[in-house]
């Protein structure tokens, strides 16, 4: 999962922690479980923080799925 990072955040309007996934310091998305039924949702931030042209936003699908799975597993492990 080279280039990816997971940061846990606590937006003021959220009841629980969320996980932000970045690639080469460019934020990609945030995963949260704010729904009443506890289902994870993903919100993409395609223009939240634009870096220079040296950051190529292209990576393997398998690596992205691994980091999304890891973020969801980490969020499940956090006590409510």
Regions found by a protein language model. Give the residues of each.
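Terminal leader/tail segments of proteins
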Residues: 1-80
């Amino acid at each position: 999962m080279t280039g990816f990072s997971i940061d846990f955040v606590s937006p003021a309007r959220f009841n629980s922690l969320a996980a932000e996934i970045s690639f080469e310091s460019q934020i990609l998305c945030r995963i949260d479980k704010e729904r009443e039924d506890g289902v994870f949702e993903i919100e993409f931030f395609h223009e939240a923080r634009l870096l220079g042209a040296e950051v190529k936003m292209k990576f393997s699908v398998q690596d992205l799925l691994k980091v999304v799975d890891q973020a969801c597993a980490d969020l499940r492990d956090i006590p409510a």
